């Protein structure tokens, strides 16, 4: 049994610890700033644009010359408001990226003009670093047995973001989850950070004809923030449907323009 003299300092210590823990807890659940949410929106919008550009460019290349891009990397880059998508592969020494085809976006976003690079144009800049980054991410990524898409976007300090996310395989079914965002060094050779955005893959079934969904919903267990691919998930749907994202302390809503609001704070 504790004596009276000993019990008092112990009680004071416990109270101090409780206050410290409460303070630390409060810090960990502070709401994200408008700038943080806007950055997620911006990356999600770019990811959706990249995905659509790669899709339409691939269709255009395969129409022009079927099977010629099998086994090649596709890499998209936005310049002056338009997307260019190149198809090619790394040289054996990984010092150049050989471009075999280039598809340039036209006035309509879904239209691409394809040109074949007969001289096998080689790139030693963005496309080279992006191709390296893709292969580094491919080597690390461990997914389930299903198709995945990959995208490369610019990151701060000339680094690269590489996204690996499940591909849509059935009409009107839009998968979300099981995705990773890598932060790769500027030269494309090293993983700086690996962010598992969602664990499992969710594939909500399409609604019956005549029914309309007010909003989708899924939960996050890995972070207290919505992810870039949550924005992508909303934007890729046709028609677009808002998505509610529940975390341990917040309820977010991703709107059909990609913007994010905090709907509720949980204690």
Predicted regions and their residues:
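A short, well-structured beta->alpha microelement
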Residues: 191-206
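Bacterial N-terminal signal peptides that target proteins for export
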Residues: 2-14
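Charge-rich, low-complexity terminal tails
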Residues: 172, 176-180, 184-186, 192-196, ...
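Bacterial N-terminal signal peptides
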Residues: 12-22
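Active-site-proximal loop/helix of nucleotide/amide-processing enzymes and allied scaffolds
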Residues: 27-116, 122-157, 202-267
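A short, surface-exposed beta-strand/turn
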Residues: 97-114, 174-192
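Non-cleavable N-terminal signal-anchor transmembrane helices
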Residues: 2, 18, 25-33
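Non-catalytic interface/targeting segments
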Residues: 139-149, 153-185
């Amino acid at each position: 049994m504790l004596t009276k003299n000993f019990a008092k300092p112990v009680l004071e210590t416990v109270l101090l610890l409780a206050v410290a823990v409460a303070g630390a807890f409060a810090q960990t659940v502070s709401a994200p700033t408008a700038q943080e949410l806007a950055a997620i929106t911006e990356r999600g919008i770019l990811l959706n644009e990249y995905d659509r550009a790669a899709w339409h460019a691939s269709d255009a290349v395969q129409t022009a010359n079927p099977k010629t891009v099998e086994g090649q990397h596709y890499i998209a880059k936005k310049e002056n408001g338009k997307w260019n998508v190149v198809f090619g592969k790394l040289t054996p020494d990984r010092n150049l990226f050989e471009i075999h085809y280039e598809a340039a976006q036209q006035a309509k976003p879904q239209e691409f003009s394809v040109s074949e690079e007969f001289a096998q144009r080689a790139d030693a800049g963005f496309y080279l670093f992006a191709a390296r980054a893709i292969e580094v991410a491919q080597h690390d990524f461990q997914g389930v047995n299903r198709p995945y898409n990959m995208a490369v976007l610019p990151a701060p300090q000339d680094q690269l973001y590489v996204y690996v996310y499940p591909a849509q395989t059935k009409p009107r079914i839009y998968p979300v989850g099981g995705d990773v965002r890598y932060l790769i060094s500027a030269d494309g050779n090293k993983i700086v950070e690996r962010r598992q955005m969602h664990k499992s893959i969710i594939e909500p079934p399409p609604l019956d004809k005549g029914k309309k969904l007010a909003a989708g919903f899924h939960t996050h267990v890995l972070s207290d923030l919505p992810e870039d691919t949550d924005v992508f998930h909303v934007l890729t749907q046709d028609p677009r449907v808002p998505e509610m994202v529940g975390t341990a302390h917040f309820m977010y809503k991703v709107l059909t323009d990609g913007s994010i609001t905090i709907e509720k704070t949980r204690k």
